[in-house]
Structure formats: structure tokens, C-alpha cells
Regions:
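Interdomain hinge/linker at the junction between the two RecA-like core domains of SF2 helicases
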Residues: 2-40
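Short secondary-structure boundary/capping segments
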Residues: 12-15, 66-71, 145-149, 164-166
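Conserved C-terminal RecA-like helicase domain
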Residues: 29-138, 154-155
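Short glycine-/polar-rich loops that comprise or flank the Walker A/P-loop
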Residues: 44-46, 143-147
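Short, solvent-exposed loop/turn and secondary-structure capping segments
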Residues: 61-62, 141-143, 159-162
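Conserved SF2 helicase motif VI
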Residues: 155-168
């Protein structure tokens, strides 16, 4: 029985991304809850995908909604929302206004509206930060993304490359 297989090495996969111009992989260590390290790691001047750990993962400290709420609270204060796209408008402590998307939400119509928005974005200013869980590996590409912040232990480098692929 013939079973076709397609294999790529990391170079081939990364080389195939349309917008990826360079790649740097860094790491940060934290003790306790990862949320305490977010303020020193997150650069709100850069377009960032934050990939939170799986709820059953060792680095998860609360349910996924609480983790998202804590990340947003770390960024600043929610001052509004775009109900048609489910983008939160967040004011940072220094007064900067950021547009934050939440793909962790289980509400299907809400998540689909945000995913559709991500596919239609045609401006760098359309989004500043995107928080995701499993969808960080599939379903959208964000050409203006500058940083992927992946929290916790991942099963493989392949999973990390898949997440990086959303930002290409």
C-alpha cells in the first residue's frame, strides 16, 4: 500500500514563508507564574503574537480566560472594544493605545469574526498584540508581526516553527 509523505526540513519550511526576512530565537526564564515575567519581556512597541500555554500544561496557572485577562491587565487598561471584530482597545500606563485581539475565546461567532478580520487586515496599524492558544499554529498569517512570544515548554521545535509561521 502506497502512502505518500511530504517531508520538509526546518530550512525549507522557514525559507518558504513569504514575509519572513530574519529569524532570531531567544529565551527568558521565570520562576512562579509566567505572568510576572511578561512586563519585562513584552515590548508593546512591536507587533506581537503571545502564545499562552495549554491549560493542562505545567506553565499554566489558571484557566485560559484568566490568563488572557491577566496579560491584558499587564499591558494596560481596557478602554473600549470594537464589537464587530472583537478587538480590545487597551491604554498602556504611558498612554499609548493598543489594539489587542483574543483568539483564546471559545465563542465561535466571536472567534470567527476575529479570524476573518485577521485575514482581511491590510494595515500595520490594524492590530498590535494577538493572544492565542491552539490557533497560534494555524488559520491565519500576520505579515506585520515582529515577535512571537511563546510561553512554556513546547513538544518540539516543529511546534515553535508552526507558531512562527503565523507571523510570516
Amino acid at each position: 500500500l502506497f502512502q505518500p509523505a511530504v517531508n520538509y526540513n526546518y530550512y525549507q519550511q522557514l525559507n518558504g514563508y513569504k514575509y519572513l526576512k530574519s529569524l532570531g530565537i531567544g529565551y527568558h526564564f521565570f520562576r512562579g507564574k509566567y505572568i510576572t515575567a511578561i512586563p519585562e519581556i513584552l515590548d508593546t512597541t512591536k507587533k506581537t503574537l503571545i502564545h499562552i500555554p495549554a491549560v493542562q500544561g505545567r506553565d499554566s496557572y489558571a484557566d485560559k480566560y484568566q490568563q488572557v485577562a491577566d496579560i491584558i491587565a499587564t499591558i494596560g487598561e481596557v478602554v473600549g472594544e470594537e464589537p464587530e471584530h472583537f478587538i480590545k482597545i487597551v491604554r498602556t500606563p504611558d498612554g499609548k493605545i493598543l489594539r489587542v485581539g483574543d483568539l483564546v475565546e471559545d465563542n465561535i461567532p466571536q472567534r470567527r469574526a476575529l479570524q476573518a478580520y485577521l485575514q482581511r487586515m491590510n494595515s500595520r496599524d490594524a492590530l498590535d498584540i494577538l493572544i492565542a492558544l491552539g490557533t497560534a499554529k494555524e488559520g491565519f498569517d500576520w505579515q506585520w508581526c515582529e515577535v512571537c512570544l511563546t510561553v512554556g515548554i513546547r513538544a518540539s521545535l516543529t511546534e515553535v516553527v508552526q507558531i512562527i509561521g503565523r507571523c510570516t
